[in-house]
Amino acid sequence: MPNFHRVVITGIGAVTPIGNNIDEYLLGLQKGINGVSGITLFDPVEHPCKFAAEVKNLKSEDFIEAKESKRWDRFAQFGVIAAKQAFKDSGLEINESNASKIGVIIGSGVGGLLTMESQAQILSHKGPKRVSPFTVPMMIPNMATGLAAIALGAKGPSSAVSTACAAGSNAIGDSFRLLQLGKADAMICGGAEASITPLGVAGFASAKALSFRNESPETASRP
């Protein structure tokens, strides 16, 4: 039998519809806030579903330089900000002696959907020469992992998980196993998603995966 290492959680970060840090998030949970309201990220007038749980009032400039954030898809910004929060909460430090034993795994179901959608429109209306050279790096699901690893200086195991709604949980599970087997000393892990776009909402609605109770969005989720 392998000699499994004990695994513990040392820090938490959160960018959510009910709070943009762990304290706000816990308070939102305690108050029973669900974060669901009318869509503001785009005009949903032609969509059968007109509400979503959006991340609001996030001050990304507190964590990411403005010039950098323009080159990052929204999902990657969420992932990096939450990772930075969790790392700070943990009290850990990364240096030359331990960097190779600290890794990052962040899951994402669709990655940079907003980037893909906006650049497809540019391609259609303005031609291929106007497509951003950052399109592919911004779009790929592993960009949140890569950017978080660079920002924190983590040089250990690094990968991304793309398993739909289970991506974040799978990222945590994969990290748990690496720690349990002694392949890493610490892992920054979780999930990041930003699929509230015209295409994302239309696609989920067409799949009958969304509620159309637009008159009462706060009570629309009925599992």
Regions found by a protein language model. Give the residues of each.
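Aromatic side chains
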Residues: 25, 42, 63, 75-78, ...
